[in-house]
UniProtKB/Swiss-Prot annotation:
Uppermost EC category: lyase
Biological role stated in the UniProt entry: Mevalonyl-coenzyme A hydratase; part of the siderophore biosynthetic pathway. Aspergillus fumigatus produces 4 types of siderophores, low-molecular-mass iron chelators, including excreted fusarinine C (FsC) and triacetylfusarinine C (TAFC) for iron uptake and intacellular ferricrocin (FC) for hyphal and hydroxyferricrocin (HFC) for conidial iron distribution and storage. TAFC consists of 3 N(2)-acetyl-N(5)-anhydromevalonyl-N(5)-hydroxyornithine residues cyclically linked by ester bonds; FC is a cyclic hexapeptide with the structure Gly-Ser-Gly-(N(5)-acetyl-N(5)-hydroxyornithine)x3.
EC number: 4.2.1.-
Keywords tagged on the record: Isomerase, Lyase, Peroxisome
GO biological process terms held by the UniProt record: cellular response to hydrogen peroxide; cellular response to iron ion starvation; ergosterol biosynthetic process; fatty acid beta-oxidation; N',N'',N'''-triacetylfusarinine C biosynthetic process
Pfam families in alphabetical order: ECH_1 (PF00378)
Gene name for this UniProt entry: sidH
Gene3D superfamilies named in the record: 2-enoyl-CoA Hydratase, Chain A, domain 1, Lyase 2-enoyl-coa Hydratase, Chain A, domain 2
Annotated compartments: Peroxisome
Family according to the record: Belongs to the enoyl-CoA hydratase/isomerase family.
Descriptive protein name: Mevalonyl-coenzyme A hydratase sidH
Motif PTS1-type peroxisomal targeting signal location, chain numbering: 268-270
Organism listed in the record: Aspergillus fumigatus (strain ATCC MYA-4609 / CBS 101355 / FGSC A1100 / Af293) (Neosartorya fumigata)
Disruption outcome: Blocks TAFC biosynthesis, decreases resistance to oxidative stress, and attenuates virulence in a murine model of invasive pulmonary aspergillosis.
């Protein structure tokens, strides 16, 4: 793991369950882990730092207490409104996640209430593991707001228009098991197994070639962003395949397979 100090994040805990995994824990349980503007900017800086650290391969985000995240700090929003200040909704959004396009995967370990901006954050995470106690919702319409940070087109893509409409227009809450059936949640697990499951998945990813993970992330981004699957496939091959084949990890992976040994991966240089 890098010895470079990570950026500080107020109201959060930053730890490293293994040398290759970063764990960010939202730690304002008395406020349902809502995120202030200052904390949002600091978390965004943490993700930028994470993407530049060659020894860190995967990140996990979770929360303490009964909530994962209830979104933005609406008390702060109310104060801004009273002063005539508009809260700008610019990319990449709350905590740097709703419209993030990172080079490394982030796993959401949803431990409880996941509402508003918290749900918008999760909708763009690469893998979602949820506690059996978790609930999800977009109550923005009940507050005179709208979920414009990035989740709506993503939910339409993942769930279909009608399911996305039910979530976004009703403001109702939905169980983790419901969203697992609909395809947004990868796994629903017992509450006390949540973090262990997320770390297990992250560890499996971290054992793989960093170059392969990097190129695979680009392929996933292309599939997400482009209308044509053929255009996305061609873009991935044209822009990344030669780089992957020329890298040390490609040669090491094939050589290790032939020699029947565990590969010794190098930090990605792609």
């Amino acid at each position: 793991m890098s010895t470079e100090a990570h950026p500080t994040v107020q109201g959060c805990l930053v730890s490293f369950p293994t040398p290759h995994i970063l764990l960010l824990t939202l730690n304002r349980p008395e406020k349902r882990n809502c995120i202030s503007l200052a904390t949002s900017a600091e978390i965004q800086r943490l993700w930028t730092w994470f993407d530049t650290q060659p020894a860190l391969y995967v990140a996990i985000i979770t929360g303490t207490g009964e909530s994962f995240c209830a979104g933005a700090d609406l008390k702060e929003w109310n104060d801004l409104n009273a002063r005539g200040i508009t809260n700008e909704m610019t990319a990449p959004g709350l905590a740097g996640l709703p419209r993030r396009r990172g080079s490394k995967p982030i796993i959401a370990a949803v431990n409880g209430y996941c509402l508003g901006g918290g749900f918008e954050m999760v909708a763009n995470c690469d893998i979602v593991v949820a506690s059996e106690n978790a609930t999800f919702g977009l109550p923005e319409v009940q507050r005179g707001i709208a979920a414009v940070a990035g989740s709506l087109p993503r939910l339409v893509r993942v769930l279909g228009k009608q399911r996305a409409a039910e979530i976004a227009l009703s403001g109702l809450s939905f169980s983790a098991s419901q969203l697992e059936r609909w395809g947004l949640v990868n796994r629903v697990v017992e509450h006390d197994q949540l973090l262990a499951t997320a770390v297990e998945i992250a560890t499996a990813i971290s054992r793989n070639s960093p170059d392969s993970v990097r190129v695979t992330m680009e392929g996933l981004h292309y599939g997400w962003e482009m209308a044509s699957v053929e255009e996305a496939s061609s873009a991935l091959v044209d822009q990344w395949y030669a780089k992957l084949m020329a890298g040390e990890n490609f040669h090491e992976g094939v050589r290790a397979f032939v020699e029947k040994r565990k590969p010794q991966w190098r930090p990605s240089k792609l």
